Each structure stands twice: as structure tokens, then as C-alpha cells.
Amino acid sequence: MKFTIQKDRLVESVQDVLKAVSSRTTIPILTGIKIVASDDGVSFTGSDSDISIESFIPKEEGDKEIVTIEQPGSIVLQARFFSEIVKKLPMATVEIEVQNQYLTIIRSGKAEFNLNGLDADEYPHLPQIEEHHAIQIPTDLLKNLIRQTVFAVSTSETRPILTGVNWKVEQSELLCTATDSHRLALRKAKLDIPEDRSYNVVIPGKSLTELSKILDDNQELVDIVITETQVLFKAKNVLFFSRLLDGNYPDTTSLIPQDSKTEIIVNTKEFLQAIDRASLLAREGRNNVVKLSAKPAESIEISSNSPEIGKVVEAIVADQIEGEELNISFSPKYMLDALKVLEGAEIRVSFTGAMRPFLIRTPNDETIVQLILPVRTY
């Protein structure tokens, strides 16, 4: 195998597939990156058997030549060393050549590295997925769906199913749900698919986070193929495979209150900054909570009290307060996480009592809902 490639594209592809490579793997060859040079271009693959990423660099794009292939072939190189080497090479082009016994030479300018490679035939095959019935979602929408839900997945392995995001497709609508049983994030999106197609799968939160880092912010369509055990995301020149989590995701529809006793509408930025300030003292206290008091026709008060340190009280003018008087305590971290993913100058918070879950939404937008469980402080 021998080819010459543009360094910037090489670095980009290697960084993408590196996201799937784990140093803690039971299969030693998976600590490497598989490189295959063919007549069409060069592909790079990284995998930890849960996530597999393949990045393809075509020979040319438009009229610009990116790769020159002198001899097709394949090799597996140690990911950690290879990724560091290509980043630090001096020139704009890199030549990679495999000689006898899988010895690989990497040249750029006057720098030359010799790396011991492994036989690419020993590398596990990527999952074979039949690509009929793909769902298509614009890249920017897909990134939003992930960003607005994945932060709420559980980080604890006690209920593994909650470490993933539930993707449910029915009646041409996708519903993404994530919860760690203290909070819940929900996002809906319309899909351009037949109404009778339905799916209900749980994608690991880690997979979605890594996928989001690889995708560019553009409107190009991503093809999504869902099977019994795997999901494949096909973007431009990138294939991203992830295993699905086993088990049934809990039904969360009953958690969402249908009516409310107190409703407030406030400026998102002012509310977020006030919670952020109150959390400065809450962080130190044992009971990491912020208290919100709302009186109709008056303002909202945000406070936090840490006996060892002191206390903070701040009043915010609400655009609207309706319903009953309310005192409620909650985790400032959960509230900040939810506020950061809502897009809009104002937010509507609906409470159904001091010990009941409450909802945070943007007025006039039903596609995204954040739910938080309050904290008992007595």
C-alpha cells in the first residue's frame, strides 16, 4: 500500500474515527485504526465494538485532488501514536507506505516515521446493515435533537437502559426522551416517512454525544438506518454505527402533568443568570438546592441558603405569574442544564405543587419539554 494525502483531511478523518477507539478493550487490535486504500480513495475505521466509525476520503472533490493512490492495500496502525504523529507532521501532504511485515513508513517534508502495523484482515468487520427504509434528518436538526436531550441521560449503571436516549417513531413523528429519574428531556420532530413505519429503540447517550461532535452544522441530510441491535448514521463520507441498548424503556408519558396550578413566564437570560448566581452558594452546602417563591401579581424570588457560608436572595420581575402562591426547591444544576438547551427569549414554567414535577417550555413551542423533580428540604 502506498498513497499521498492532504494532511488537513487526514488529521480530520483520524480525529473523527479516534472517537470510537478505546484504550480499554479486550480485543487488542481495536486499539488501532484500520486504513484501507482503494482506487476510489482512503477509508479509516475506529471501533470499540459498541461504536464503530468509518471516515472516507475520496480521491478528489470537485476539481481538487486530495489523495494520490500508488498502490491499494490496507493496514492497522496504533491509534494513539498515529493520531499524534499526523497532527505534528511539518508539510501539507503526507505519504504513507506499507512495506514487508506490516512496517509502515509515514513521510512528510524531511520527517520520516516507521511504525509497526498489524494485519488489517484480523480487524473485526463492521456490522452489515441492509440499507432499505432509511429515515432522513437534516444534520442541524439531528444535532439539536441530541443536544436538547442527551444531557438528561443517567450516568449510573444501576439502570443501564436510562443511560440511553429513547427514540420512538410513530405516525411520521420522532420522539426523543431522556431521563435519569430526577429530570426528563423530551423533543419531538416531524419526519418525512410513511405513517405506518414505527420504531422504538434506545441509543446509548455516549454514542449520540460522539456522533454530534463529528457532524458539521449544515442542512445536508443524514440517513438513519435502524435494525434490531444496531443503528447506522450515514452522513457525507462518514458511517457511524452504534449498538442499541437491550431492554424496554420505561413509559414516561404519565410523568408529565397535564394541568398546572402556578404558571410563570420569565426572560430566559435573566432567569438563567439568577439561578446561576444562587447556585454559587448552593454548591457548597450539603443540600445543593435553590428555592423559588412565586406570588401572583408580584415578582419571583430566587434564594439559596448555606448555613456555613451565607445566603443569597434575588427578585426577578416576571412577565406573567398566574395561579396559586408557590414555594419550591430544586437542583440548580438540573435547572441550568434545561435552560441552556431551550431556544427563545422567554420561558414558561408550569408548576402543579411544591412536591410535584414541573415543566419548562418555550411559549408557543410544543416540540421541546423539560421536566424536573423538586427536592424536599424538610
UniProtKB/Swiss-Prot annotation:
Keyword line: Cytoplasm, DNA replication, DNA-binding, DNA-directed DNA polymerase, Nucleotidyltransferase, Transferase
GO cellular component, one term: DNA polymerase III complex
GO molecular function ontology, one term from the record: DNA binding
Factors inducing expression: Part of the dnaA-dnaN operon, which is negatively regulated by DnaA. Transcription seems to often terminate between the 2 genes.
Keyword Ribonucleoprotein: no
Protein family (similarity comment): Belongs to the beta sliding clamp family.
Name listed for the protein in its UniProt record: Beta sliding clamp
Originating gene: dnaN
